[in-house]
Amino acid sequence: LSRVAQYANRELSIGLREITPEQATQYLEIRSEEVGQKTLDMERQAIQAMMHFTSKKLNQDERLAVIKSEHQQILKSRSYTPEQLNIITESQRPQNALSTQLAHAAGLRGHELFTLRRIEERGVSDRPALAEKFQGREGERYTVQGKGGLIREVRIPTHLANQLEAQRLPEPKHVTDRTINYIQHYKISAGRAWAASFSRASEKKLGGSEGAHGVRHSYAQERMYELQNSGINRDKALEIVSQEMGHFRPDITETYLR
């Protein structure tokens, strides 16, 4: 539990025994990109036992939500070239194609497409931000809610932002994807439905699929090239990309460069 205690102290300014079930779930969501399912389950069970017997934050019949690890998915996925992504979007329905373009342009996870908001509508979480963040990327400022409830800024090219705003819903709607609830503000594809559409189009047109997560690999690799080409050293570029993608760990950025 030492790692959980460090997280509680560093990110939440509380002790281990003060952590709530909701905060524990946020921690596990963040860890899901860093470790495999076995380790993630062991950490969840350790936190759960602590909450049952020590902090009493959970009743004996209550359980922490089981979080699926994305670590293997990140390791296995590979990037797509811009040309390959164009081929994929051309064979998708407009709603799915727009989501693919948005995910590629801003390095989004599939579920983050549900959470897109203009930046003036919602503030961002307090996290480190280097001055060179988004350097070389023009566009409109939006936010998404990512792993662990973290709200971060993303940059969307103006022509895509215009298409997105044309899909703004008259009223936000509640949607559920993979048992998680979201409030959606735009009529675009996201989550499981978008990922399935992406994989089908990739298999049909390219003869195989690296999965929708490959779009994030493409973003990471393109941004690393852009930043280094502008004179920024590799270590700093890794840190910038980690901030833009919402994991804030340069070593995780490395896994996207395979």
Predicted segments — roles?
Residues 1-76:
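N-terminal core-binding DNA-recognition domain of tyrosine recombinases/integrases
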Residues 70-87, 148-158, 175:
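DNA breakage-rejoining catalytic core of tyrosine-based enzymes
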Residues 82-111:
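Basic, Lys/Arg- and aromatic-enriched nucleic-acid-binding interface segment
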Residues 103, 114, 242-243:
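The alpha-helix within a helix-turn-helix
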Residues 116-162:
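Conserved tyrosine-mediated DNA breakage-rejoining catalytic core shared by Y-recombinases
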Residues 155-221:
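Active-site/catalytic core of tyrosine-dependent DNA strand-transfer enzymes
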Residues 207-228, 234-243, 247:
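Short basic/aromatic active-site micro-motif
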Residues 243-258:
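Catalytic-site neighborhood detector that most strongly recognizes the C-terminal catalytic loop/helix
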